[in-house]
Amino acid sequence: MNVLVWGTAEQGPCAYFRGHMFDEEWKKMGINTRHISRVNFIAKPGAEGMETEEAMAKGLLSVDTSDIDWADVVMFRRYYNCSAKCNTCGVATKDQAAIRVHPHKMEFRDSITEWLWPAFESETFDKAIIYETDDNHFQIRPWNGYFPDVKAEWPLITRMAKRADLLTTSTGPIAAHYGQFNDNVRVIRNAIDPSIYTTSNPRPEHGGSKPRVVYYGSTARMRDYAGYPSGPGGKWEGGYAGKAIEELRKELWNVFIGVNPGTEHVIAPFFDEAFHYVENIQQFAKNLASSHPDIGIAPLGGDDFDRSKSELHWLEYAAVGAAFIGEGFKYGEAPYSMVRHGVDGLLARTRTEWYEGMKSLVRSKDLREQLAGAAKERVLKEYDYKERAKEWADAFKWAVEHKGIWKNGRRNT
């Protein structure tokens, strides 16, 4: 079986945990994967100097479909930046009139995916299609730096979700939301390759014997850690994890992994040590292991976008032997619902819960080791990427066997 992954980046965490990590395991099962980030064109004499649309209209330029022809399954993922983007003010739009009059230079990024989409929607297209997402892009908040990009793609995301023969995702809340577009939704939870979470670097001497508390993400995730202004009056909300750590600061060594260039000044007041953001997952895993965390924290703001996130922080902290404390939600499935509070991690939602949880972890090495050990044992058993690869293989097989089933779905709703 041949699987074509459309427009994916090798480095990023989403592409890795929902694709590249499994390539070698899939190969053992007879599944070949091809990840492409561009489409080639075949030009005939006379096409030189013409705009793409003009050359194609005159029959002088055609899409090289060899990758698509090779595939049994084509997988589309998350969203594609088909809008034009202003890198000066952050505006993203597909409105040609707005692009022409915009005062700054607009950068065109993916000009092919949306343009080709009618061909994938065609009744004559004979390949199975999977749409995969590990975020609920319809719940992204305006403060998120990717909001303009994602909002511009909502119509295409909807079309992709409706067109798919099978829709795959990482969590129940995403599956519930995207189920309005497609009857065939399968949850395939994230997994890890424990072999990459290792290091030969010794435990750093700075911080001495204090327990090392680690938080990772990107600088934007400081909103989850330190809180945020809300409402017309700008009342400060959240930030309970950061407040708890500040109150215990003299008893711990605080580490952040994921500083974006140029934002060091944002991180510096809160942390004793920091690592810059890296996109390559193997390098990130090494950095995480090299930080030698005793405690790994995973605060969240708690909105519907956050509710759709996966348990990846818990998995990765467990892999490097850190005791976990993460955001609890009042009701329903949430990122860390699978964590057994007091057994293989702690959950906290209120300011009191975060403080009491952090205090117990900081002051008890025995508790840290107990929680970390139980979490690692469970993660190695239940979240092995080799087992998850089999779930993906079954999804590919199902999609091929049911290709065209989307025609009986909700395409026109």
Positions of PLM-derived features:
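N-terminal pre-catalytic "stem/leader" segment of glycosyltransferase-like enzymes
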Residues: 1-89, 93-95, 102
